Amino acid sequence: MGEREEVKLLGTWYSPVVIRAKIALRLKSVDYDYVEEDLFGSKSELLLKSNPIFKKVPVLIHNTKPVCVSLNIVEYIDETWNSSGSSILPSHPYDRALARFWSVFVDDKWLPTLMAAVVAKSEEAKAKGMEEVEEGLLQLEAAFIALSKGKSFFGGETIGFIDICLGSFLVLLKAREKLKNEKILDELKTPSLYRWANQFLSNEMVKNVVPDIDKVAKFIEEFEDRAQYIRCF
């Protein structure tokens, strides 16, 4: 790409969906300017102008053109900088379809279940919600075994689309485990997924991008009783 190319990312430090864009940019060795947004205060004019429909982060601005929605951004990065780094999406159409399917599963089924359990008021509702979260993780365990084919990641030897989609929530999960003294990723129940999580977070492309677990735990503790908590992620 040309020297005059301008890349800017609007985000919030604690947001898993923003982490997705950051990891993709890192994988593709893309230099960019980062703009921190305060979603609990006044949203910037740039954010409202760049994403007038959803008014949410992340937003990738590439040569003045905004790209919105986290997984859409990841695909855009993969296609735009296709000569840099390994491909994020698989090359075969069927494998790409599977990657998108499981990413939809994470965002449209598993994540809403997790967030409902997090904000549930009664212990009964929390317990039921966490059972459903565990069921989803068992399904993801089976998917990992099938898709990774004995390799380190859902994408095989390298971090791919599903890895970014699910892996972006690992710091949140570990922060809750630490804060609540509860196990979400269980080494005995989902051993392959447990190993994958450790490999993902220790990967050079990830560990300097994701926020500190203790910092996220403190943030959760401060905001989880507020109605706005759900907006954090």
Curated annotation (Swiss-Prot):
<feature type="binding site">
    <location>
        <begin position="42"/>
        <end position="43"/>
    </location>
    <ligand>
        <name>glutathione</name>
    </ligand>
</feature>
<dbReference type="InterPro" id="IPR045073">
    <property type="entry name" value="Omega/Tau-like"/>
</dbReference>
<feature type="binding site">
    <location>
        <begin position="56"/>
        <end position="57"/>
    </location>
    <ligand>
        <name>glutathione</name>
    </ligand>
</feature>
<dbReference type="InterPro" id="IPR036282">
    <property type="entry name" value="Glutathione-S-Trfase_C_sf"/>
</dbReference>
<dbReference type="InterPro" id="IPR004045">
    <property type="entry name" value="Glutathione_S-Trfase_N"/>
</dbReference>
<dbReference type="InterPro" id="IPR036249">
    <property type="entry name" value="Thioredoxin-like_sf"/>
</dbReference>
<dbReference type="InterPro" id="IPR010987">
    <property type="entry name" value="Glutathione-S-Trfase_C-like"/>
</dbReference>
<feature type="domain" description="GST N-terminal">
    <location>
        <begin position="5"/>
        <end position="85"/>
    </location>
</feature>
<comment type="function">
    <text>May be involved in the conjugation of reduced glutathione to a wide number of exogenous and endogenous hydrophobic electrophiles and have a detoxification role against certain herbicides.</text>
</comment>
<dbReference type="InterPro" id="IPR040079">
    <property type="entry name" value="Glutathione_S-Trfase"/>
</dbReference>
<keyword id="KW-0808">Transferase</keyword>
<dbReference type="GO" id="GO:0009407">
    <property type="term" value="P:toxin catabolic process"/>
</dbReference>
<feature type="modified residue" description="Phosphothreonine">
    <location>
        <position position="158"/>
    </location>
</feature>
<dbReference type="GO" id="GO:0005829">
    <property type="term" value="C:cytosol"/>
</dbReference>
<feature type="binding site">
    <location>
        <begin position="69"/>
        <end position="70"/>
    </location>
    <ligand>
        <name>glutathione</name>
    </ligand>
</feature>
<keyword id="KW-0216">Detoxification</keyword>
<protein>
    <recommendedName>
        <fullName>Glutathione S-transferase U15</fullName>
        <ecNumber>2.5.1.18</ecNumber>
    </recommendedName>
</protein>
<comment type="similarity">
    <text>Belongs to the GST superfamily. Tau family.</text>
</comment>
<dbReference type="InterPro" id="IPR004046">
    <property type="entry name" value="GST_C"/>
</dbReference>
<dbReference type="Pfam" id="PF00043">
    <property type="entry name" value="GST_C"/>
</dbReference>
<dbReference type="InterPro" id="IPR045074">
    <property type="entry name" value="GST_C_Tau"/>
</dbReference>
<dbReference type="Pfam" id="PF02798">
    <property type="entry name" value="GST_N"/>
</dbReference>
<keyword id="KW-0597">Phosphoprotein</keyword>
<keyword id="KW-0963">Cytoplasm</keyword>
<feature type="domain" description="GST C-terminal">
    <location>
        <begin position="92"/>
        <end position="219"/>
    </location>
</feature>
<feature type="binding site">
    <location>
        <begin position="15"/>
        <end position="16"/>
    </location>
    <ligand>
        <name>glutathione</name>
    </ligand>
</feature>
<dbReference type="GO" id="GO:0006749">
    <property type="term" value="P:glutathione metabolic process"/>
</dbReference>
<dbReference type="GO" id="GO:0005737">
    <property type="term" value="C:cytoplasm"/>
</dbReference>
<dbReference type="GO" id="GO:0004364">
    <property type="term" value="F:glutathione transferase activity"/>
</dbReference>
